[in-house]
């Protein structure tokens, strides 16, 4: 009887969760107002083959209402600017996968800044955070409404996400002092091992002489 009550309660909870989830319309990236914002990025270092250093280099980012405008501009309350993975850095990495359902999309996990909407040109200079992984990136700005839902966006690259990309090298986490300490420890271990064997041989000879 107790088991039946538990099963019934579990089914009731599951159905309740499903009904709550179904009550909210699934929000899709393709339904956002595309190109509503003009977004540009200027890395602190540029040129062929240049790779930016996490924790050191900076991005100068600008955004403004695009020339084509947006029919949903009245809904814009906050602009959220994010660092996003470009396709080359998403290959074989499902945790970075692009998904049309915004709730499931993992393209832009790195928050840069959030500011109240202003149609005039806005800018920020952002230092690449120390925990940014090695990869190829672009910047996207979302226009968010009063209830926190994305309604429009603009990005620093084209629709195919192939232009105006930049590369970042992550901090390795290793320091010269650690490498020196590691070498010293290895040398000490070898010396200690040699001394140990020499002492053991000496003890063995003394025992034999007795």
From Swiss-Prot:
Residues 1-22 form the signal peptide. Keywords: Cell membrane, Membrane, Nitrate assimilation, Signal, Transmembrane, Transmembrane helix. Its main location: membrane. Highly expressed in roots. Detected in shoots. Induction: Up-regulated in roots by nitrate. No effect in shoots. Induced by sudden N starvation and by low nitrate concentration. Disruption phenotype: No visible phenotype when grown under normal conditions. Reduced growth on low-nitrate media. It comes from the Eukaryota. It holds the Pfam family NAR2. GO terms for cellular component: plasma membrane. One of its GO terms (biological process) is response to wounding. The keyword Heme does not apply. It is found in: Cell membrane. GO terms for molecular function: nitrate transmembrane transporter activity. The chain crosses the membrane at residues 178-198. Acts as a dual component transporter with NTR2.1. Required for high-affinity nitrate transport. Acts as a repressor of lateral root initiation. May be involved in targeting NRT2 proteins to the plasma membrane. This is High-affinity nitrate transporter 3.1. It comes from Arabidopsis thaliana. The gene is NRT3.1.
């Amino acid at each position: 009887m107790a088991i039946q009550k538990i099963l019934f309660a579990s089914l009731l909870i599951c159905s309740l969760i499903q009904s709550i989830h179904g009550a909210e319309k699934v929000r899709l990236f393709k339904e956002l107002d595309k190109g509503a914002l003009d977004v540009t990025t200027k890395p602190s270092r540029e040129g062929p083959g240049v790779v930016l250093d996490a924790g050191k280099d900076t991005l100068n980012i600008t955004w403004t209402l695009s020339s084509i405008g947006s029919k949903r501009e009245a809904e814009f309350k906050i602009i959220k600017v994010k660092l996003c993975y470009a396709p080359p850095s998403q290959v074989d990495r499902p945790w970075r996968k692009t998904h049309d359902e915004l709730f499931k999309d993992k393209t832009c996990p790195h928050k840069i800044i959030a500011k109240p909407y202003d149609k005039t040109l806005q800018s920020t200079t952002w230092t690449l955070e120390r925990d940014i992984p090695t990869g190829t990136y672009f910047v996207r700005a979302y226009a968010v409404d009063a209830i926190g839902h994305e309604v429009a966006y603009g990005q620093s690259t084209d629709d195919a996400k192939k232009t105006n990309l930049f590369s970042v090298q992550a901090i390795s986490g290793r320091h010269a002092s650690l490498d020196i300490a590691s070498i010293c420890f290895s040398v000490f271990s070898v010396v200690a091992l040699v001394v140990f064997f020499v002492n053991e041989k000496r003890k063995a000879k003394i025992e034999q002489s007795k």
